[in-house]
């Protein structure tokens, strides 16, 4: 199973908040990665999104936390012309979404995988495109997609 988690999911592994309802799913995904039960693909822009949040929210720990995430050595997909054009087309079709979110979703569509996000607003806008799930509603390990 190919999963494309966005920054909102990845950050849960290092900025843990027990009060968040989707923490169980985030932890399950992390454990599944370590056990080689799922394959992760990410657009290269994930580094910028995650680095930005860590630098702003945890400036004293940002370098250490970012190193932990980089150690996963995720397979990254560069944003070439064809990919970028698909992202822009996706934005046109799904009004009001960001290039960042669309890049993750388009990658999941291209890989026939699942875009996993904690962003309810995005899922509501884009679920008709398929291959997207809200982390809090994700049935860990199943192929259920919205």
Question: What does each of the following model-derived ranges do?
Answer:
Residues 1-42, 55-64, 129, 140-145:
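Short, well-structured N-terminal submotif of metal-dependent ribonuclease cores
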Residues 2, 42, 47, 76, ...:
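Acidic, PIN/NYN-like endoribonuclease modules and their adjacent C-terminal/linker elements
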Residues 6, 101, 119:
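Acidic active-site catalytic centers that drive phospho-/nucleotidyl reactions
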Residues 9-10, 49-53, 69, 86, ...:
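A general alpha-helix detector
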Residues 36-39, 92-96:
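A short glycine/serine-rich beta->alpha loop
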Residues 44, 81, 101-102:
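Glycine-rich phosphate-binding loop at the start of an alpha helix
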Residues 59-65, 72-77:
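Helix-adjacent hinge/juxtasegments
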Residues 70-94:
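Acidic catalytic patch
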């Amino acid at each position: 199973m190919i999963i494309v988690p966005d920054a909102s999911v990845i950050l849960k592994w290092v900025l843990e908040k027990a009060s968040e309802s989707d923490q169980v799913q985030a932890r399950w995904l992390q454990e599944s990665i370590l056990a080689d039960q799922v394959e992760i693909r990410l657009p290269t822009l994930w580094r910028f999104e995650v680095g930005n949040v860590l630098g702003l929210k945890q400036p004293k720990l940002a370098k250490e936390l970012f190193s932990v995430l980089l150690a996963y050595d995720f397979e990254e997909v560069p944003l070439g012309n064809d990919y970028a054009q698909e992202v822009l087309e996706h934005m046109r079709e799904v009004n009001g979404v960001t290039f960042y979110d669309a890049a993750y979703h388009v990658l999941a569509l291209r890989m026939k995988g699942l875009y996993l996000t904690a962003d309810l607003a995005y899922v509501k806008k884009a679920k008709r495109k398929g291959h997207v799930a809200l982390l809090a509603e994700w049935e860990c390990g199943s192929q259920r997609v919205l």
